[in-house]
Structures are given as structure tokens and as C-alpha cells.
């Protein structure tokens, strides 16, 4: 059995790290489409085709279940994939829904009508493509009423993180938080709607202030996956070993990933 984890670059490693800790007995195959990163500035068609190609590569590795550990792909491609493309014997899950369930205090599969929730003012930090898709607002509207969402497209942050430039990433995060607070001075909650952003979570929290609850995805997705596999064990595919694949330069990506997670990670060419 093996589960696939896909991201346009290295951000999905934050999700991989959490799911590996939660499910140590499950092998995971990670696919980073580093050659085409970042996805956040691409159009929806482009993101759809790249995400389908990556998903097929993970199916070929024996992963019947693939997690799109990339909010841009989850937002811009997943709905279309589920409606038009994914065969019956495979599953592809996004990273948005576990986050929204946590925010709206719902259990998985609770399809009751939308209702009032405690949090009324939510700041969303995400890539330009995720913000443009409005997928977060759409999914939230299925579950909650009366929630005001102010979205901030965070241009440049993913690039800075992928390049290992922490000083630039921190400066960009602070400027994006400032820009959002001009439009929504007192958010109650903030969503880090990109799997790269947990690496900058302390900076987001500091810039937003201690009274703002910051939601980041990795642990929420790990719990959701554990729950899913307990209910549907048949989707733990027949792959047997963990591996890391990249469309980029394996040596360069391995070095950045090792820096990223602070443990040795070795990628091979996809």
C-alpha cells in the first residue's frame, strides 16, 4: 500500500511530514513538479493538465489515493478532475476541505445545510491562482453562513521560500498581512491557504497579532487522511516503498528539501 502526495514544488513536504508522523506504517510517494513551479501564477487550464499528469505518474507508482498537497491545484483543478477525469477505482483528495471543516467545526461527511459559526471575519492568505478561483469561498458557503472572507493574493512568497531566501519571504509576508489589515483590520481567524506557508507561520502570527487564530493545513490533512483510510482501506494502493520524485534537478531539489524539513531527503528524477 502507498499513498501519493503531490505538490508543484516543496510546500507539500509540510503535509508529507505531518502524514508520515500520523501514519508511520504507510509508505508515501512524493511528487514535486519543480520544473513547472510555481503554479500560483498559471491559468486554470495549465494547472489542470499539469496536475493530471502528476497524478497519473503517482498512480503508476501504485498510489490509488493521491493527495493534492497544493492549494492551487486543489482550488483550480480538483473539481474539474473529479467531474470529468478520475476513474472509479482511484481517489484524489484536496487540502481545502479539512481546513474548512476545522474552521466550521464539522466532522468529515457532515452534509447538513450551512449554519452560523463562531468565526465571522476570516483572512485568507493564498497564491494569486487560489484567490482567483474563489474555491475557498465556494466550499465555505456550503458549510457556513454569515462569514466574511477577505483574501490576500501573496505574490512572491512561494518563490522566495523555494529559493531558500527567508529574509525576502519574511518581508513579503509582513507586507501582505499589512495590505490585508488595511481592508480587514480585525480578522478573528487567518487561513494559511498554501502548503508552503506553515514554514512562515510564526511570522504570520506575529504580524497578525496573538488574538488571531491561525489555521495551517498539515496536521488537519493528516487527521483527515487517517480517518479516510480507516473508512476506505481499499484505497491504500499496492506500492510498497516511500520515495521522492521530481521533474526538476534531483540534486538541487534534494538539497532544498533537506534544508526545508531539516532532515536528509533524496529525490530522484521523475
UniProtKB/Swiss-Prot annotation:
It is an enzyme of class 5 (isomerase). The keyword Isomerase applies. GO terms for molecular function: glutamate racemase activity. The keyword Phosphoprotein does not apply. GO terms for biological process: cell wall organization; peptidoglycan biosynthetic process; regulation of cell shape. It comes from the Bacteria. Substrate binds at residues 7-8, 39-40, 71-72, 195-196. Its EC number is 5.1.1.3. Gene3D superfamilies: 3.40.50.1860. Signal peptide: none annotated. This is Glutamate racemase. It comes from Cereibacter sphaeroides (strain ATCC 17023 / DSM 158 / JCM 6121 / CCUG 31486 / LMG 2827 / NBRC 12203 / NCIMB 8253 / ATH 2.4.1.) (Rhodobacter sphaeroides). The gene is murI.
